[in-house]
């Protein structure tokens, strides 16, 4: 069948556009804060890297428990929208509490609440997105959604950068007052996102599981290819620590807080421009090829982070890091939809996202310890090795 990607946007289900707009607004809010949190912890509160890794790991791993059961619950109810909106709302409610943060434990509590909200919404949202797209549009739909997500991150970073420039001018490290102003500004797009999703998204019919045929969390329930893919993703994720360490590496190599914002905007611009086209490409040439290319680029970029000597090198490498994200993020979710029946997708996405989240705790803790007790290059070498191993297993196991 001849592919005509230029005509696809006009034929996409309206849900895909509303979910994309909601994610865009959410990321405007979230990215104003998320990438400043490690700098707030390190520069303002004086927290060590091992604790920063622990905070990121605990937040993601705790949310993983919610991801499993929210996905299973959405399968049992045959309804996705309610859980999706509830998750976005909880994350919105948690954000203002960062304004009062004075200890790392306080930050952990807010991060925990925010990630629980993400855990509630992610699996049913992905199932809703998959159910709203035709099979031959699925990669494109996920790519468009991720592109909107990342475009929101780009604008959010731009707003954060403007606030930093206006409030602390030439000061190179983040200050408390600046962070508090960013927190207040982030609330507006978060509230708008919840309204867009609540009013715009419509439920998509899905087969409701009967009481004697409820989706289970047992491993053997799923196809061998899905199980193999999850195992390979876990191996990769163990070396894919929080991006907080890349941000700190940039500062370690001389980038100011405004330059770090610029670096992050470069990453998001690259990702936003490529996510849609590469998602569409995966519909034609296959998901595994793009995943392998993405993980290979990741390994080379992480090796570059380890060997870099200047902030400019970190900035350039972070642009290539955006290519890795565009090649893998939406494509991985489309691959899950390809190999799992529709009535199990909520549960499958819950397990898939949970596997990543559970791996995030040891990944970030290991990275923090390697940074603190060996050297700042060590976590990146570790990540590069595991990414290349995962790429090999993707080719040999997931067939």
State each model region's role:
Residues 54-72, 265-278:
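Central cavity-lining transmembrane alpha-helices of secondary-active solute carriers
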Residues 6-64, 226-263:
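Helix-loop boundary and gating motifs at the non-cytosolic
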Residues 2-13, 202-232:
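Juxtamembrane intracellular "pre-TM" segments in multi-pass secondary transporters
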């Amino acid at each position: 069948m001849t592919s005509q990607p230029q005509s696809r946007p006009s034929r996409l289900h309206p849900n895909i556009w509303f979910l994309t707009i909601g994610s865009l607004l959410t990321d405007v809010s979230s990215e104003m804060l998320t990438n400043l949190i490690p700098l707030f912890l390190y520069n303002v509160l004086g927290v060590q890297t091992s604790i920063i890794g622990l905070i990121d790991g605990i937040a993601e791993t705790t949310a993983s428990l919610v991801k499993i059961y929210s996905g299973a619950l959405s399968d049992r109810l045959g309804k996705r929208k309610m859980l999706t909106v509830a998750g976005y709302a909880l994350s919105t409610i948690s954000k203002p509490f960062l304004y009062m943060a004075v200890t790392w434990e306080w930050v952990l509590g807010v991060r925990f609440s925010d990630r629980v909200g993400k855990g509630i919404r992610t699996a049913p949202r992905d199932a809703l997105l998959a159910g709203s797209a035709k099979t031959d549009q699925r990669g494109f739909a996920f790519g468009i959604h991720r592109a909107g997500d990342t475009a929101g991150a780009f604008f959010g970073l731009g707003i954060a950068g403007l606030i930093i420039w206006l409030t602390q001018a030439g000061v190179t490290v983040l200050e408390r007052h600046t962070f508090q102003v960013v927190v207040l500004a982030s609330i507006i797009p978060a509230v708008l996102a919840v309204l867009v999703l609540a009013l715009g998204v419509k439920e998509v019919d899905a087969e409701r599981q009967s009481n004697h045929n409820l989706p289970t969390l047992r491993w053997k329930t799923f196809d061998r290819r899905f199980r193999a893919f999850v195992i390979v993703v876990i191996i990769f994720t163990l070396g894919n620590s929080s991006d907080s360490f890349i941000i700190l590496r940039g500062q370690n190599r001389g980038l100011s807080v405004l330059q770090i914002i610029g670096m992050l905007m470069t990453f998001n611009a690259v990702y936003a421009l490529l996510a849609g086209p590469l998602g569409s490409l995966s519909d034609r040439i296959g998901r595994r090829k793009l995943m392998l290319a993405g993980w290979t680029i990741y390994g080379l970029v992480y090796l570059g982070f380890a060997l870099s000597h200047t902030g400019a090198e970190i900035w350039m490498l972070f642009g290539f890091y955006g290519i890795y994200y565009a090649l893998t993020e939406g494509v991985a979710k489309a691959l899950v939809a390809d190999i799992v029946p529709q009535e199990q997708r909520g549960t499958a996405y819950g397990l898939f996202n949970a596997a990543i989240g559970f791996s995030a705790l040891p990944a970030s803790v290991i990275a923090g310890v390697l940074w603190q007790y060996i050297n700042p290059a060590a976590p990146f070498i570790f990540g590069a090795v595991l990414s290349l191993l995962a790429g090999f297993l993707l080719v040999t196991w997931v067939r």
